[in-house]
């Protein structure tokens, strides 16, 4: 279908420059716009889904007044934020103060350039996609640090210090987890990583979900998911913006769309971590069972459903667990997750050299 649309667009004009330069550029812009619209729509309505789940957990209704069943509540919230004044403290560094939110949201959006939504559906299906993701997602912490420092205020600065140490700590554990997946997949290409989970004994008998990486790499899967909570500053790791300690951390002095950009980055990163979890450990767009009924469903729907379940797990953890102390978070990252992920890196490496290697 995508190839058909591309061919139709290429044939709109007979001029050589159109097929050589014009249409490829227009086609790339269309794909980028479509992906950004999907991501922004998911981010917008994840806020509503989170508020409804929190309400159900607390035995109340949640947003249900704006539109049918409250479905227009996110749009009303967006309109409210767009019309609010963006305030700036008098002592703040003006340029850096406004640069911080931009540097926070841009990596969260740029990372989607290499995310495959199907076997042949990606903005850029590059061989070093995993390496690109590890690099681009590490840049978000700079926006948080700049925002906290440029506000010239006590609470934002403390939040920025916490953010820098927490993100660096858990990025190491996440990096080791991704290295393990890289070892068993023998590729940095995200499409190849998904394809590598569709082989083995269980895949041959139709139980695809048992051939995915989550089962043989279960400790790595759990470490990656929990580290993802810490990377996205979600409960129980939200000491960066702990309301009872430093009000809202690095976002204290922000309002209007500046504050909204931080929220956009947070929820975009939640979806990014969820999609990556699905691609690395849950078979990506592969159906869980090899049957006509399941194979009839398009792969991008399977990817979306699995990612939505992981996002729901993020919200479930928020509503179920209390916030950790800062020293407990650092201890968990440095004394448990990093050593365990390193040990499993060695274990999997040794496993792959034995006759019982299941990733051949």
Curated annotation (Swiss-Prot):
The name this protein goes by in its record: NADH-quinone oxidoreductase subunit H
Predominant location category: membrane
UniProt gene name: nuoH
EC number(s) per entry: 7.1.1.-
Membrane topology: Multi-pass membrane protein
Superkingdom, taxonomy of origin: Bacteria
Reactions catalysed, as given in the entry: a quinone + NADH + 5 H(+)(in) = a quinol + NAD(+) + 4 H(+)(out)
Membrane as UniProt keyword: yes
Organism: Albidiferax ferrireducens (strain ATCC BAA-621 / DSM 15236 / T118) (Rhodoferax ferrireducens)
GO cellular component: plasma membrane
GO annotation terms (biological process): aerobic respiration
Record field: transmembrane: 20-40, 95-115, 126-146, 168-188, 209-229, 269-289, 297-317, 332-352
Location(s) in or outside the cell: Cell inner membrane
Subunit text: NDH-1 is composed of 14 different subunits. Subunits NuoA, H, J, K, L, M, N constitute the membrane sector of the complex.
GO MF, one annotated term: NADH dehydrogenase activity
InterPro entries membership: NADH_UbQ_OxRdtase_su1/FPO, NADH_UbQ_OxRdtase_su1_CS
Functional summary from the UniProt entry: NDH-1 shuttles electrons from NADH, via FMN and iron-sulfur (Fe-S) centers, to quinones in the respiratory chain. The immediate electron acceptor for the enzyme in this species is believed to be ubiquinone. Couples the redox reaction to proton translocation (for every two electrons transferred, four hydrogen ions are translocated across the cytoplasmic membrane), and thus conserves the redox energy in a proton gradient. This subunit may bind ubiquinone.
Family the UniProt entry places it in: Belongs to the complex I subunit 1 family.
One Pfam family this sequence matches: NADHdh
Family matches, as PANTHER family: NADH DEHYDROGENASE SUBUNIT 1 (PTHR11432), NADH-UBIQUINONE OXIDOREDUCTASE CHAIN 1 (PTHR11432:SF3)
Keywords per UniProt: Cell inner membrane, Cell membrane, Membrane, NAD, Quinone, Translocase, Transmembrane, Transmembrane helix, Ubiquinone
Annotated disulfide bonds: none
